[in-house]
A protein has these predicted regions:
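Mid-domain, small-residue-enriched loop/turn segments at the edges of structured enzyme/sensor domains
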Residues: 127-189
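C-terminal motif of bacterial Sec signal peptides marking the signal peptidase cleavage site
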Residues: 13-16
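Structured C-terminal helix/loop/strand segments within mature extracytoplasmic catalytic/sensor domains
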Residues: 18-28, 32-34, 50, 132, ...
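Acidic helix-start/capping segments at beta-turn-to-alpha-helix junctions
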Residues: 84-99, 133-134, 160
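Short, conserved catalytic-motif segment at the N-terminal edge
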Residues: 36-38, 42-58
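Positively charged n-region of N-terminal signal peptides that target proteins for export
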Residues: 1-4
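Conserved catalytic neighborhood of penicillin-recognizing serine enzymes
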Residues: 94-129, 136
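Active-site SXXK
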Residues: 48, 59-91, 252
Length: 284
């Protein structure tokens, strides 16, 4: 009986190693096909199964950080206080603010700031969220309290999108970002109402339609936040992916870039990476 148990354990171990090797090879093929660097952290929260690839490599996170900043503000703001007024001045407005540019010298609300940054990736809205949190000093304190000493928020929008691979500013790793995303949004730190509000925004935004959503099986529900830096072809997407009938999501972080500063990003790198990873989770 003992020999049988050991044999079964060995077979399962070999099978797991074989699957991991196959996943690695498939992701390397995506890198080679597009001459890109790919980083992945994926966690099936229903089974605790992980898929990782270059998970400790640093990438510019770009606008994907808006998911973390929005979650932090929702963490500290009760749902019945989301209509708290916030004044928008002309000096607040930065490039790419399609919503907030209509509110110059007017009041908006915390709820509207989060909607603007998550649905439309409004840069001014995210800057104002950071200010509501007490600035990056407080944001970094919160990250460290979540055991994230890797993610390095530093600059406001839009400067944070000017990625320099020689600097750690405004970068993270897929693994660090994914674990923090999971802790903040999925692990019970938000009220039920605020979590539902944020996840619904991530489902309904359209900026990620060509990214993880495109690579996911048709019957999977995807709640995502995309990001794109202005250098090194940085293109990212972070998501909670819900297989059909599942209430517990797959946490998926995909960061990509290229070696040339003026190289252009390609959404297919992200979508094809997502397809590889999610097919592995979908294998029976």
């Amino acid at each position: 009986m003992k020999k049988l148990i050991l044999m079964i354990a060995s077979i399962l171990l070999l099978s797991a190693c074989s699957t991991a090797d196959a996943t690695t090879q498939d992701l390397k093929k995506v890198e080679d096909k597009y001459d890109a660097n790919v980083g992945v952290y994926a966690l099936n929260t229903a089974t605790d199964k992980e898929i990782t690839f270059n998970e400790d490599k640093r990438f510019a996170y770009a606008s994907t950080f808006k998911a973390l900043s929005s979650a932090m503000l929702l963490e500290k703001t009760p749902h019945n206080e989301l209509n708290k007024k916030v004044h928008v001045s002309k000096e607040d407005i930065v490039p790419y603010s399609p919503v907030l540019e209509k509110f110059i010298n007017k009041d908006t609300s915390i709820k509207k700031l989060i909607e603007a940054t998550m649905l439309y990736s409004d840069n001014t809205a995210n800057n104002m969220i950071i200010e509501e949190l007490g600035g990056y000093k407080e944001v970094n304190k919160r990250l460290k309290s979540l055991d994230d000493k890797t993610t390095k928020p530093s600059r406001m929008e839009p400067e944070l999108n000017n990625y320099n691979p020689k600097s750690n500013r405004d970068t993270s790793t897929p693994q660090a970002f994914g674990k923090t995303l999971n802790k903040l949004i999925n692990d019970g730190r938000l009220s039920k109402e605020n979590k539902t509000f944020l996840i619904d925004l991530m489902i309904n935004n359209k900026s990620g339609d060509t990214l993880i959503k495109k690579g996911a099986p048709k019957n999977f529900k995807v709640a995502d936040k995309s990001g794109q830096a202005i250098t090194y072809a940085s293109r990212n997407d972070v998501a909670f992916v819900y297989p059909k009938g599942e209430s517990k999501p797959i946490v998926l972080v995909i960061f990509t870039n290229k070696e040339g500063k003026t190289d252009k990003p390609n959404d297919k790198v992200v979508s094809e990476t997502a397809k590889v990873v999610l097919e592995k989770f979908n294998d029976k």
